[in-house]
Amino acid sequence: MTNIRKTHPLIKIINHSFIDLPAPSNISSWWNFGSLLGLCLMIQIITGLFLAMHYTSDTTTAFSSVTHICRDVNYGWLIRYMHANGASMFFICLFLHVGRGMYYGSYTFMETWNIGIILLFATMATAFMGYVLPWGQMSFWGATVITNLLSAIPYIGTTLVEWIWGGFSVDKATLTRFFAFHFILPFIIAALVIVHLLFLHETGSNNPTGLNSDADKIPFHPYYTIKDLLGVLMLILFLMTLVLFFPDLLGDPDNYTPANPLNTPPHIKPEWYFLFAYAILRSIPNKLGGVLALILSILILAFLPFLHTSKQRSLMFRPITQVLYWMLAANLLILTWIGGQPVEHPFIIIGQLASISYFSIILILMPISGIIEDKLLKWSL
């Protein structure tokens, strides 16, 4: 009798995706982040569901409902901080996952890559709306500042902002709809993840060399299930260390003050994982220009397949582009630091230089270095 996992209509889908899936034999730990992102999404949906049972999306009670969760609900503090810090872990894994894709040329799987970009945008939208829900000072002012950016759109901007707000300012209508969207989006993300995997399994995984690995495939289980399990344990260790010892390390103290429309905090800034994009936004003096640069800072990922000039897929054997890649990584850290600093000298000029180099490295220097490397190898025509 044939094994049920190979014949049952539902189980065989899981079998082809996680058990008998042919995987390259040489994929490194950089390939662990896909499964870790799946784990993060599950943690966020489960903790979020339990938080939603006790949360009220009303401006008068939102802040106190979060306080109630932390003080009165059994292990409410644990659920709340797992959810808040789980978002940080989610973005750490996301950035490393995207960085891996850039380094090893995984963006040549166009469908998988484009769904990934949509997933990144959806996750950023979800995280932004989630940050508004506790209705602290930074929640309120963050929502006001970021939604206000849409007013830079010519002609329809102001109308659009008021439509999103549900009034003439961020108020009860805004909070209620943000809660509704924050609840539904993770399930949309989960559906997109399935599509992401569907497209990936059409082509099979990439590997560090960037070469075709059809001649040397191994089954996903037990080799990569056990490898993923190590990553899972490390992620949980890191997350729980953060939650139990440093729960407020990545948060903003201003968010422990209830939202007050009459009192603006001295430095309005988003969560740490948006700071690089926030720095790019602030580095351009023009409002519309800043918004376009902000969107382009993420959307530039969609142009990577067209900017690939090298005859090699991966950066594994491309030392010049490797140097540029790590310069880009360092540049992103500088942008993250600048995004959290006040708008004054010398931070303004550092942010502007870092923004210019961010786009220059991706759009100009990396494509040129790809051509140079091909010439050095006498591969070019």
UniProtKB/Swiss-Prot annotation:
The lineage of its organism: Eukaryota, Metazoa, Chordata, Craniata, Vertebrata. It is found in: Mitochondrion inner membrane. GO terms for cellular component: mitochondrial inner membrane; respiratory chain complex III. Heme 1 (or BL or b562) is low-potential and absorbs at about 562 nm, and heme 2 (or BH or b566) is high-potential and absorbs at about 566 nm. It comes from Apomys datae. Keywords: Electron transport, Heme, Iron, Membrane, Metal-binding, Mitochondrion, Mitochondrion inner membrane, Respiratory chain, Transmembrane, Transmembrane helix, Transport, Ubiquinone. Belongs to the cytochrome b family. One of its GO terms (molecular function) is ubiquinol-cytochrome-c reductase activity. One of its GO terms (biological process) is mitochondrial electron transport, ubiquinol to cytochrome c. Heme b b562 binds at residues 83, 182. The gene is MT-CYB. InterPro entries: Cyt_b/b6_C, Cyt_b/b6_C_sf, Cyt_b/b6_N, Cytb/b6-like_sf, Cytochrome_b, Cytochrome_b_C_euk/bac, Cytochrome_b_N_euk/bac, Di-haem_cyt_TM. This is Cytochrome b. A ubiquinone binds at residue 201.
